[in-house]
């Protein structure tokens, strides 16, 4: 498929720079279950769209302050380098995107505040590099936490700098496992009050972990989806989590993924019969129209970028044309887009 098939117009003023307050007051566009059916709701209305026996699947990854600013020194000359961590390789190694990468050679060192430094061990395409830090394990984690900033998406960072509000705003209610460099943004809408209302409905919940990487922000540069390569992300579904999901389905409940990260991990761990298995490892699953969903029945997600892999994913749940019509409706009704924006509840096409 052509990547241009997934393009659409989005006025820049609809890109949300701050979240709704309270979080569950964000708007929610319900798409389906009937073809072309749309309903303008609020996230606080979510319980009314759930049934007793359904199970909500959350991603409990926690965002780390993965944007670092350091200095490369070469004799008397120096250059400021922005480092965006995106994938941990070992106790002292990270994959990262560097800017400007051209100002760094192999084996050169980047110095960060607090005495932390990193050597460039490998250079790849698009500014990607392999870094080995001067600290490892928990000591490295603490140094990154002290020196780093919250890694706001580029479309927000271009408009304003990260601040103290983002430290809380860019974490979900369920954030528990440090390792993500981007938030699983559908989870940002949940509050204790909303969770209580969901529980009162007889809906169960389960948490799994997918550490979201910076690759989620990378533009698709290929012209055809067949030639696009996804960045891999680490995830885990425990035996108990898989059992809870399978039990809910066996009893007639629907699997409701909160966010595309939860959906992608579930679809990476499911077999042809629809049974979800324990999973620990990396996934680079790339879902486009024509994909047959085996694990997920309903998806709650935010509004995504034109030509992005995530807009391709939601188009696979319904159809590209139906999702374009839904997004056109959202634009006309001035829904707020992207990470801090409003939500969609998308029923899988039957």
Swiss-Prot record:
Annotated metabolic or biological route of this protein: tRNA modification; tRNA-queuosine biosynthesis
GO BP terms: queuosine biosynthetic process; tRNA wobble guanine modification
Locations listed in the record: Cytoplasm
Top-rank taxon, per record: Bacteria
Reactions the enzyme catalyzes: 7-aminomethyl-7-carbaguanosine(34) in tRNA + S-adenosyl-L-methionine = epoxyqueuosine(34) in tRNA + adenine + L-methionine + 2 H(+)
SUPFAM superfamilies: QueA-like (SSF111337)
Gene Ontology annotations for the cellular component aspect, listed alphabetically: cytoplasm
Subunit note: Monomer.
Family of this protein: Belongs to the QueA family.
HAMAP family, per database record: QueA (MF_00113)
Its biological purpose: Transfers and isomerizes the ribose moiety from AdoMet to the 7-aminomethyl group of 7-deazaguanine (preQ1-tRNA) to give epoxyqueuosine (oQ-tRNA).
Name of the protein: S-adenosylmethionine:tRNA ribosyltransferase-isomerase
Organism: Parvibaculum lavamentivorans (strain DS-1 / DSM 13023 / NCIMB 13966)
